[in-house]
Amino acid sequence: MKQDHSAQLYDEAKSLFPGGVSSPVRAIKPFPFFTKSASGSHITDVDGNEYIDCCLAYGPLILGHGHPAVKEAITKQLENGCLYGTPSEIEVKYGKLIQKYYPGMQKLRFVNTGTEATMGAIRAARGFTGRDKIVKIEGGFHGAHDAVLVKAGSGATTIGVPDSLGVPVDVVKNTLQVPYNDIHALEETLEAHKDEIACLIMEPVMGNMGPILPKDMYLRAVRNVTRDYDVLLIFDEVITGFRVSIFGAQGYYGVEPDLTTLGKIAGGGLPIGIFGGRKDIMETVAPQGGVYQAGTYNGNPLSLTAGMATVEVLEKESVHHKVNAKGKALWQSLTDIVRGLRMEGQVTPTGIASMFQLFFGPQPENYEQALKCDKLKFNEFWKHMLQNGVFFPPSQFETNFLSLAHSQADMEQIVTACKKSLAAVK
């Protein structure tokens, strides 16, 4: 596979950007491919190599690249302007549509990224409760702000240790950690810090270490325990919102949090974040209350237009039914390949079909178990997949995604590429 132009661009990029990229996950070794264009389920690099895209920009593109309805909506909005600095009608329309599927978001705030959404939700929880401590799940990723940049799986301690230079220990000393799928660890932590904890923030389905599904009744138990200890529950649905179902993971599992964060799919491929929840909590947010949050690009009409167009397609075209049918067939095919090769490996998860990953090891249930998989073998597998024309996210702990745009031919090529790649790394 020829990648000369990508290699040249990477050399130039290294003189411009830290590590040659604008986000660390893109720093593929020895160099990343540089994208020229993308359409539907395919992405093409500057050297003319075309790949079936199962990364899909790390989750936002459930309709695929450049869906006609989304492009048409953006084009129409551009004719009316791309940024106002005032409220707009699209905010009201899209806000009502969000509430239709996430009724627990009784009031909400449009922001620009998932990071901003989780930061706003945590700040609102702290402001509402008057408490400083928060709990997060080991291995859970909630953006790049200081309070949640805590090293996961840090041995026996639950006290936060910064996972980035530049984050003061004093900032994260109020960030506690518990393992996923362990209700007893959560109870013990809440008991040990009774009346000190503002909130638990968690991905209901762990999207940044797998994905990994909740055990039966785990989320319901989390909801009950947080209520018992008067701790607010935040579901970070930046990945799972509009992905697990149109109602998100909270609708899929029937568990309503106090606060929700959305992003990715909710922006239709443009930058967005949303946080919202119970009316009494959200009324502490400025200008109604004393919890400050603001932004020049909040409520950006282009992002809201793209997001609303995406959700309308999800409604009209039974997207989840179609994508899940593809995903279930793919899961079975990949599982059969792994078993046929007698490899120690798992295709996870088994129940949510548009999200999947291959683990070379036992089925993980939490971050500590996920870390024990054979990451070196995954890296080799990933390289073979790219050579075979399929682009998976380059990290073992990221999630592969399917979209409406993936055709039957795409699915067959993914299976063929996996069979060749798995055989090569056996």
Swiss-Prot record:
GO terms for cellular component: cytoplasm. Its cofactor is pyridoxal 5'-phosphate. Keywords: Cytoplasm, Isomerase, Porphyrin biosynthesis, Pyridoxal phosphate. Pfam families: Aminotran_3. Its EC number is 5.4.3.8. It is an enzyme of class 5 (isomerase). Gene3D superfamilies: Aspartate Aminotransferase, domain 1, Type I PLP-dependent aspartate aminotransferase-like (Major domain). It is found in: Cytoplasm. PROSITE patterns: AA_TRANSFER_CLASS_3. Pathway: Porphyrin-containing compound metabolism; protoporphyrin-IX biosynthesis; 5-aminolevulinate from L-glutamyl-tRNA(Glu): step 2/2. GO terms for biological process: protoporphyrinogen IX biosynthetic process. It comes from the Archaea. The modification N6-(pyridoxal phosphate)lysine is found at residue 264. It catalyses: (S)-4-amino-5-oxopentanoate = 5-aminolevulinate. InterPro entries: 4pyrrol_synth_GluAld_NH2Trfase, Aminotrans_3, Aminotrans_3_PPA_site, PyrdxlP-dep_Trfase, PyrdxlP-dep_Trfase_major, PyrdxlP-dep_Trfase_small. GO terms for molecular function: glutamate-1-semialdehyde 2,1-aminomutase activity; pyridoxal phosphate binding; transaminase activity. Belongs to the class-III pyridoxal-phosphate-dependent aminotransferase family. HemL subfamily. This is Glutamate-1-semialdehyde 2,1-aminomutase. It comes from Methanocella arvoryzae (strain DSM 22066 / NBRC 105507 / MRE50).
